[in-house]
Structures are given as C-alpha cells and as structure tokens.
C-alpha cells in the first residue's frame, strides 16, 4: 500500500508548498511505476508458466489421441460385426448373444486439468487473441469428446443389458429389434467421436495462427 506522510517541518511559503507537492507527486509516480513493474513481471511469469503447462498437457493428449484413434477403429469393426450378426439372426434365427461384442476397448480420457486451472487463475486474459483462440478451439473439442464418450458408454451399457437378457444367447425378435436400434445409435456415436478425434488431431498439428482457417473451412462445409 502506498502511504503519503505529512511534512515534518511547517511550510512557510508557496514555493516550499509547491516543492513539497512536486516531491509527493514524483514519489507517487515512482511508487506506482514500481508497483506496475512488479505486476507486469508477475503476469509475464504467470503467462509463461501457463504456456509451459498447457504445452505439456497437449503433448500428453497427443499420446491419448493416438490410443483413442486405435480404440475407435476397433470399436467400429466390432459394432459393424454386431450389426451383421443381428440382421442375419432376423432371417436365420440362431443363438448370437455370446457372439455380440460391446465394449469401449482401451479408451483413454483426455486431459484438461491444466486448462481448467489457467481458466481460473486469469492467465488466459494475458494471452494474445490468436493464441487464446488456439487453446479454446482444442479444448472445446476435447470437452465435446468427453461428453460424447459418456453418452457412448451409456448406449453400450444398454446394448450389453439387452444382449444378456437370454442366458443361452437365443434373443427374441423384439430383443433383436431393440439391439439393432441401439447398435445403430452406437455406430453413429462412434462415427461422430472419430470425426472429433480427427479434428483434434488436425488442430494439434497446426500452428496457432492456422486455427481460424480450419474453423472457416468447417463452417463452409
């Protein structure tokens, strides 16, 4: 806190008064300048730290993304095989319950703890517009991935429950119809997740200034 102290000696003339006022003004300006300098370097350090931590987190997410792309490829093959079995069972009834595979595989949750932290501590307000836009674009995509993954998990659990209704694997025509519907929903979710992963992959390979161009192309399509 900046404090202004009264003069120790009595002021006897206007000249002394103005000299005293000038000294106070200069002192205040110096104090404010020093304070602003401290704040500037604090913000600069805070921004540099945020950049380092976000860079490290996105590096981890690149590894997570590679695993998740493998997982959705496997899931796509499994769900397509399930759909083929279900359609075949409609025309040629046979025990298929044990042959159906509904799983999330080796799906990994993307990381966003650092992003959530820097949103709270004010570091984002210190970034240039293009840099902020870059991180917002990527982490909004990651947020949607998390949301869609949760919804996918719920549909897969429903499909598993239906497939387990018959211990011997002989599903009723109604069970098969329900499974076809749910499996179609799972296929759509997996396809959408694959698209989101590709968008994340594309963004992680781009430079900060290229992100607006990506969004422009997506909006045109």
In which residue ranges do the predicted regions lie?
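N-terminal signal-anchor/signal peptide hydrophobic helix marking the start
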Residues: 11-25, 29
